[in-house]
Every structure is written in structure tokens, then in C-alpha cells.
From Swiss-Prot:
GO biological process per UniProt: ribosomal small subunit assembly
Cell division among keywords: no
Region of interest (G1), ranges: 15-22
Protein name, as recorded: GTPase Era
Domain KH type-2: from-to ranges: 205-283
Keyword Zinc-finger applies: no
Main function: An essential GTPase that binds both GDP and GTP, with rapid nucleotide exchange. Plays a role in 16S rRNA processing and 30S ribosomal subunit biogenesis and possibly also in cell cycle regulation and energy metabolism.
Cell compartments where the protein resides: Cytoplasm; Cell membrane
PROSITE patterns registered for this protein in UniProt: G_ERA, KH_TYPE_2
Region span, G5: 153-155
Entry-linked InterPro entries: G_ERA_dom, GTP-bd, GTPase_Era-like, KH_dom-like_a/b, KH_dom_type_2, KH_sf_prok-type, P-loop_NTPase, Small_GTP-bd
Membrane-protein topology: Peripheral membrane protein
Transmembrane portions of the chain: none
Length: 303
């Protein structure tokens, strides 16, 4: 019988786009709950991942990459990321070891200097650099502000992630178990389905298309005869030309998106899935507050 006290708390993961925040959280959770691609601003909402052991529960908040916004959607994403500073117990400031400190990192650092909670510097992607460079990178960041801890990791390979979990546990206070031990995210299945479809579009399309799409899951029902889950989803674009790209020649692209998304959705749900997708044009939806709210990007939820 153990006398160890149960610890819990909320941990925000902040950083520029593409530094590996979602990769880290998916690794810790042991399955995909945050989508990934090489496109900037892949994560748009705050994604909560729940890591529970016998002695602790850490609720990770994977935030959108902080960048200079160019539309109302971008502004929503940045405000969503910064709002986590008001609701977390620890901040992980994640940077990429293979990229030099930029104005983006400097902007985040200025905000973090005002944080009233411990800030841990996480140097990710150490597998991409020579070990001798690590000291130089850490020295550069620690010259800008004081961090409570510095932990180098490779989220992709899983290197040193256990040490980071141990470090977080040390920073957290005793607290309750906020979520059931078998729950790994607070987002509903429909949200995760939409995100998995959007991920495949990010992977398969280029130029302006990835940033111009939203996905809504309109219906999820089980077919009593086949046992399959019937999902109806809508892909929203801003231009007629973008709709043509999503559909592809003879519908090739939309079929490819559906096939790849269905595979991940079936793994997540543990059931066979029939996925039906439609493409709808909504001109300039990223700058319309009503459309943003309809598609799940409601700024009031993050204020």
C-alpha cells in the first residue's frame, strides 16, 4: 500500500507552429488526439490530452502555434493559445532545436515573462542536431529569461519524454482526479472526426487550400443492419477553385481524403465506418465571426 499523494494539474504547451507540440502530446497519450502535418497552424483549437497514472493526472493543453494573425481565424488561434496562461499550473515552452530563435519566439518569451506559473523550456527535435549544439541552444534561450527547468527531448523518437513527465509531476501540487482514468481527451468524437478529415486535406493539398478549409461532422449514426457507423461530414472552402481541388479529377481527391481519414477514424472508434463527405463554398468564412462560431472557432469560449 502506497502513501504517495495524488497530484494533478493543467499544463499548457506553447510555441511557434511546427515545433512538435502535437507530436509530443500524441506520444504521451499513446494515440492520436491532435492532428499533425508540415503545414503551419495545423492546430486551431486548444486540444486537451489527459495523462493519468496511479499517482498523477496531467491535463495537457496543446495550443495553436503562435504566429502573426492575418485574419479573424488567425486572431482566434493566437488568443486561444495565450488564454491558456490564465488557466494552467505549468507552461511548457517548446522550441525546435534545428531552428534558430526567431521574432516569434521572442514575442512568446515577452508574454511568458509575465506568467505567474513555472515555465519549463522544452528543446524538441534534438535528434536533428549534433549533441554539441545543445548547450549553445539552451544558453541562447536562458539568456532571454529564467526558466524553472530545461528539458531536451525528441517527441518523434520518444527520447527523454519520461524525464519531462517526471519534471512536470514534481511541479504539480496535490489535487483531485479531474477526469476518469480511461479518458484521454475532453473533446467529443465529432470534433476528433472533423480534425482527422482536415488532417488528410492538409497532407494532400498545397498553397492556399490547407488554410482555407474547415470541416464539420454533421451526423454520426450506427446502421443497425451492418453495424457500421455512418458519418456525414462537410468540408468548407472559400473559393470555387478550392472546391475543384478538394474534389479532384473525377472525384479522385475527395475519395483519397475519405479513404485515408476513414482508416484513422476506424482506429479511434474501434468500429467499421462509412464516411460520406460533401464540399461547400462559404466565401471568406475565416473573417466572418458567425461562420467561425458555426465551424467551432468561438473566441468567447477562450476568453
Amino acid at each position: 500500500m502506497t502513501n504517495k499523494k495524488f497530484k494533478s494539474g493543467f499544463v499548457a504547451i506553447l510555441g511557434r507552429p511546427n515545433v512538435g507540440k502535437s507530436t509530443f502530446m500524441n506520444h504521451v497519450m499513446g494515440q492520436k488526439i491532435a492532428i499533425m502535418s508540415d503545414k503551419p497552424q495545423t492546430t486551431r483549437n486548444k486540444i486537451q490530452g489527459i495523462y493519468t497514472t496511479e499517482n498523477e493526472q496531467i491535463v495537457f493543453i496543446d495550443t495553436p502555434g503562435i504566429h502573426k494573425p492575418h485574419n479573424a481565424l488567425g486572431d482566434f488561434m493566437v488568443q486561444s493559445a495565450y488564454s491558456t496562461l490564465r488557466e494552467c499550473d505549468v507552461v511548457l515552452f517548446m522550441v525546435a532545436a534545428d531552428e534558430p530563435r526567431s521574432t516569434g519566439e521572442n514575442m512568446i518569451i515577452e508574454r511568458l515573462k509575465k506568467a505567474e506559473v513555472p515555465v519549463i523550456l522544452v528543446v524538441n527535435k534534438i535528434d536533428k542536431i549534433h549533441p554539441d549544439r545543445l548547450f549553445e541552444i539552451v544558453a541562447d534561450y536562458t539568456s532571454q529569461m529564467e526558466f524553472s527547468e530545461v528539458v531536451p527531448i525528441s517527441a518523434k523518437q520518444g527520447n527523454n519524454t519520461e524525464r519531462l513527465i517526471d519534471t512536470l509531476s514534481e511541479k504539480l501540487d496535490e489535487g483531485p482526479q479531474y477526469f476518469p482514468e480511461d479518458q484521454i481527451t475532453d473533446h467529443p468524437e465529432r470534433f476528433l472526426v472533423s480534425e482527422m478529415i482536415r488532417e488528410k486535406i492538409l497532407l494532400l493539398t498545397r498553397e492556399e487550400v490547407p488554410h482555407s478549409i474547415a470541416v464539420t461532422t454533421d451526423q454520426m449514426t450506427r446502421d443497425e443492419e451492418t453495424g457500421k457507423i455512418h458519418i456525414m461530414a462537410t468540408i468548407i472552402v472559400e473559393r470555387k477553385s478550392q472546391k475543384g481541388i478538394i474534389l479532384g479529377k473525377g472525384g479522385d481527391m475527395i475519395r483519397k481524403i475519405g479513404k485515408m481519414a476513414r482508416r484513422d477514424i476506424e482506429i479511434m472508434l474501434g468500429d467499421k465506418v462509412y464516411l460520406e463527405t460533401w464540399v461547400k463554398i462559404k466565401n471568406d468564412w475565416r473573417d466572418r465571426k458567425m461562420d467561425l462560431a458555426d465551424f467551432g472557432y468561438n473566441r468567447d469560449d477562450y476568453m
